[in-house]
Amino acid sequence: MLRYWGEIPIPSGQTNRSSFDLLPREFRLVEVHDPPLHQPSANKPKPPTMLDIPSEPCSLTIHTIQLIQHNRRLRSLIATAQTQSQQQTEGVKAEESEPLPSCPGSPPLPDDLQPLDCKNPNAPFQIRHSDPESDFYRGKGEPVTELSWHSCRQLLYQAVATILAHTGFECANESVLETLTDVAHEYCLKFTKLLRFAVDREALLGQTPFPDVMEQVFHEVGIGSVLSLQKFWQHRIKDYHTYMLQISKQLSEEYERIVNPEKATEDTKPVKIKEEPVSDITFPVSEELEADLASGDQSLPIGVLGAQSERFPSNLEVEASPQAPSAEVNASPLWNLAHVKMEPQESEEGNVSAHGVLGSDVFEEPMSGMSEAGLPQSPDDSDSSYGSHSTDSLMGSSPVFNQRCRKRMRKI
């Protein structure tokens, strides 16, 4: 059998197989796995829980955390008290329910609410520049304490736990604390690297575009000015502590009102209002106004009809009516209808100046009489409108109705 150089010998027991025989008989889906979480602290030994150096936490922050826990407990007590009162209203006996506990006391206020380096409350977190001639500025004096990696990790872990408790979280898993500690560790590394580059650049060039290298690094990482730390201390730490004190006081008072409602009613005294004598103010009434009230306008207020001089201006001449005048009756706008035929009553045929009564011919009259060419003429072939038999009514005396009638007469 001819063999080539480098040819792999085929065992005698193995038969020739095609490429299709090498394919798998059943196709299986490949399982997708998430990429593993990058946690820098996973490959390093876990530091012990006890700190190598004593920590000095801020008393203001610790007291704020205690107030948050106290407020959480007060809210649970208030919810329990409200549930019991609701059950009593529904018919559950008071003996079956457990007695409400007394209001727990607020955590004591620490004596030193400010850190050791921040005793002045008027200027908290004040920035002080070191004296260039001092030993600290020259790097002389006591040696600086160097922290090991385990000590830094422990302090950072405790700081992250304090921040979460100050924010309002009651509990957290250890894996969450480890992950957030790694995030804070990476942020600190980035900050210190930028600070190292800025210091070297300032030493090389002899100047920096910012007032200080620390100010430059603060802008590069996105914090802003160095004064933003002072604003954060004032608003997020001090003002938040004052707000928690107010909330604790309000919740304590609310729980006391629920537990002791009788005491709450005794404490609330009624507000006394000093009574002063009130004198009646009299307004003089003119003689002309009394004369108008004596006329037929007494049925409506003065503000509706107006005075006699306001209803009939001096420059408007009222046409004389051949019939008996009755201005007091027909002057009311409530009885004046523009296109309604007015007929006298049967008992007052002689005096047609009284109020007209609607007759049946008003509704039986065809609409062809109301053409657009003009209005129908009055029965006595006068030029006045067909609205009323009395020309001294409001329709004849009012300038509004007079102008409209004369305008239509010009069209005719």
Curated annotation (Swiss-Prot):
There is a cross-link at residue 269 (Glycyl lysine isopeptide (Lys-Gly) (interchain with G-Cter in SUMO2)). The modification Phosphoserine is found at residues 106, 321, 332. Keywords: Isopeptide bond, Nucleus, Phosphoprotein, Transcription, Transcription regulation, Ubl conjugation. Its main location: nucleus. The keyword Transcription regulation applies. Residues 81-107, 364-412 are annotated as: Disordered. GO terms for biological process: maintenance of protein location in nucleus; positive regulation of DNA-templated transcription; regulation of DNA repair; regulation of RNA splicing. It is found in: Nucleus. One of its GO terms (cellular component) is SAGA complex. Sumoylated. The keyword Translocase does not apply. GO terms for molecular function: protein heterodimerization activity; transcription coactivator activity. Residues 384-393 have a biased composition (Low complexity). PANTHER family: STAGA COMPLEX 65 SUBUNIT GAMMA. Component of the STAGA transcription coactivator-HAT complex, at least composed of SUPT3H, SUPT7L, GCN5L2, TAF5L, TAF6L, TADA3L, TAD1L, TAF10, TAF12 and TAF9. This is STAGA complex 65 subunit gamma. The gene is Supt7l.
